[in-house]
Amino acid sequence: MTIKVAINGYGRIGRNVLRAHYEGGKRHDLEIVAINDLGNAATNAHLTQYDTVHGRFPGEVSVDGDAFRVNGDRIRVLAQRNPAELPWGELGVDVVMECTGLFTSKEKASAHLKGGAKKVIISAPGGKDVDATIVYGVNHGVLKATDTVISNASCTTNCLAPLVKPLHEKLGVVNGLMTTVHSYTNDQVLTDVYHEDLRRARSATMSMIPTKTGAAAAVGLVMPELDGRLDGFAVRVPTINVSLVDLSFVAARPTTVEEVNGILKAAAEGELKGILDYNTAPLVSVDFNHNPASSTFDATLTKVNGTLVKVSAWYDNEWGFSNRMLDTAVALAHAR
């Protein structure tokens, strides 16, 4: 069964979802049939073909009337503000990827269902009313056929949860604090402007900017047994892509660097293969650009003092997350 997918909102995540689909070998279980975005179609085609972060698309993108042609495939292009008025039923859309950042609650995202879509995945942390928050590889098995609107969590939660899962299963995570050293994103500013958050008011290109994140606490939505045990904050830094999670936690028993690294190596080679990668080389952030894994554990940075453990993982906050959107779409459509 081929899942028909539509993308609503063609920004960083929307474009990378499309590129990941084609660059990953074009999955035969999924077909992108439509894109809805208020931007000019020719401009969006150009931005798909040429990307500052991920380079030139290794294929062909052109505009054909009311559609894109991507490697010969025709993808309908729409420009409708109200999701309820989109022709999802006419196009046979199984799953809408809601990538605008505007419809992040079940109530708002359900407008796509009124348009005829069967399911919706929000590409951001969802409201409390969503049917599930999913980190593929960690808890996608909880999906049910009755789920209609789900959240794909955040890029940082998608990095953190695969790191925490095997550690909690083998060592027990009593509690922990996380810092994500995060590349700047489009919700920041190039030069100082008025903002209610005085740190967010400052130039993204000139400073390290501490700010809040719900990524650590959201692990409790994915692994309920850890609800309330994790917290943290973000430091936005002047790099365009790739971020680093730094997690310190108290284990339920004493451990060693060797045991911690062994646990995560086994997970990366086993149940989390393709989701969690394992690195032993002395690399820097740019080396993980365009890496499709959700999380790359860096074994060279592990520190242990009795029950106090520090682990670190790199993640391409655009590319890894976009690949998981595709995985989650297929899992949601096939949920029983």
Swiss-Prot record:
Annotated site residue numbers, Activates thiol group during catalysis: H182
Chain residues that bind D-glyceraldehyde 3-phosphate: S154, C155, T156, T185, R200, T213, G214, R236
UniProt-annotated binding residues for NAD(+): R12, I13, D37, R81, S123, N186, N317
Gene3D superfamilies xref list: Dihydrodipicolinate Reductase, domain 2 (3.30.360.10), NAD(P)-binding Rossmann-like Domain (3.40.50.720)
Oxidoreductase in keyword set: yes
First-tier enzyme category under EC: oxidoreductase
Residues of the active site: C155
Task performed by this protein: Could be involved in carbon fixation as a component of the Calvin cycle. Catalyzes the oxidative phosphorylation of glyceraldehyde 3-phosphate (G3P) to 1,3-bisphosphoglycerate (BPG) using the cofactor NAD. The first reaction step involves the formation of a hemiacetal intermediate between G3P and a cysteine residue, and this hemiacetal intermediate is then oxidized to a thioester, with concomitant reduction of NAD to NADH. The reduced NADH is then exchanged with the second NAD, and the thioester is attacked by a nucleophilic inorganic phosphate to produce BPG.
Subunit structure: Homotetramer.
Protein's recorded name: Glyceraldehyde-3-phosphate dehydrogenase, plasmid
